[in-house]
Amino acid sequence: MFKFNDEKGQLKCSFCGKTQTQVRKLVAGPGVYICDECIELCTEIVQEELAKDEEVEFKDVPKPVEIREILDEYVIGQDSAKKALAVAVYNHYKRINSNSKIDDVELAKSNIALIGPTGSGKTLLAQTLARILNVPFAIADATSLTEAGYVGEDVENILLKLIQAADYDVEKAEKGIIYIDEIDKVARKSENPSITRDVSGEGVQQALLKILEGTVASVPPQGGRKHPHQEFIQIDTTNILFICGGAFDGIEPIIKRRLGEKVIGFGSEKKNADVNEKHVLSHVLPEDLLRFGLIPEFIGRLPVIANLEPLDEDALVDILTKPKNALVKQFQKLLELDDVELEFEEGALIEIAKKAIERKTGARGLRSIIEGLMLDVMFELPSRKDIEKCILTKETVADNEPPKLVLQDGTVLDTKTSA
């Protein structure tokens, strides 16, 4: 056996140097030794670091103003939604830190409903919140869920995604955030209860009630359906923040009708002419969600309702250029790796925004538009060492003309003949 060079030939701890006679235990490894005292000290250090991490995550929750400022770095516009989210998230984690009770007053959970058109930033807001708070985050699609006992995913599979995001640390997952997308797709077909089964609509809402409110759920570790002979992961959903997002197409007429505006009719004046067509969603109330098809119990578990406005041309141009991870910056970085400078003319940015509005895809469609414009250039450039700059012009977007390529000697290359 390996021995350290000391006069008595005794084994020593590789960390503190104490001999085996000076300590109670000496644990041997391949050529190294550690004593029980050093093991105890290392354990304390690790526990302190873990406690410090937890303290950073859940004790030092950013103030609503700070949350809003960080959201501004990644998400353009949507000021009212950011404010509502910042307050709701701050109150949620403040509630966790107080153990849900202050002077015997129990603090209820503030789950959030995000209502806004496709591509307005619902998912990005939820993702950014999780990044700010350094908590596990999972996205689930409500359209894949069905009531227990039917073909489709059980609602418990949503919780499994969160547990996986937390590397199977259940305690950490219990303080995470779950974003359920397309929640409007599980609205029942009419606001009146049906005597027939609606397994992908009202049935899903019923199944989600318990986990939204707070319950100890049994989650199959491998996903899929439950069966009696398998082990389950137990997770308490009381402190999990749920954000339910959806476009809620068709809710605007419901809101207008409530506000007293005539949706159909000739020769009748609008009773509420102040309602701007673009800002109808800002007037949404729980009763509108009820008429849309969400059940009262489900609406009651989403006390915070934040609406996102459709993005206009200016907002889309800002989204292309201003955020930390703006698409223009991403594509410039991609070409920079091939030693090529990429420039977007102002006219090109405006035309890209117009195309996204025409396609009704919002910010989500911006990337696919730029990918289409850049495909030929990104195919050719890695093989060319004489190109110094690529310029996307208004004509590139509007008239499908190729981008301008500038050679190292300053010559502007006609890409139509460059191949």
Curated annotation (Swiss-Prot):
One biological process term in Gene Ontology: proteolysis involved in protein catabolic process
What is the designated name of this protein? Answer: ATP-dependent Clp protease ATP-binding subunit ClpX
Family that this chain belongs to: Belongs to the ClpX chaperone family.
**Cited SMART domains:** AAA, ClpB_D2-small, zf-C4_ClpX
Which PROSITE patterns is this protein grouped with?
CLPX_ZB
Domain ClpX-type ZB, first and last residues per copy: 1-54
Task: List the InterPro entries hit by this protein, alphabetically.
Answer: AAA+_ATPase, ATP-dep_Clp_protease_ClpX, ATPase_AAA_core, Clp_ATPase_C, Clp_protease_ATP-bd_su_ClpX, ClpX_bact, P-loop_NTPase, Znf_CppX_C4
Q: Which residues bind ATP?
A: P117, T118, G119, S120, G121, K122, T123, L124
Q: Where is the signal peptide?
A: none
Q: Which is one Gene Ontology cellular component term of this protein?
A: HslUV protease complex
**How would you summarize the oligomeric state and partners of this protein?**
Component of the ClpX-ClpP complex. Forms a hexameric ring that, in the presence of ATP, binds to fourteen ClpP subunits assembled into a disk-like structure with a central cavity, resembling the structure of eukaryotic proteasomes.
MF terms in GO: ATP binding; ATP hydrolysis activity; ATP-dependent protein folding chaperone; protein dimerization activity; unfolded protein binding; zinc ion binding
| HAMAP family hit by this protein | ClpX
Instruction: State a single Pfam family of this protein.
Output: zf-C4_ClpX
Top-level lineage group: Bacteria
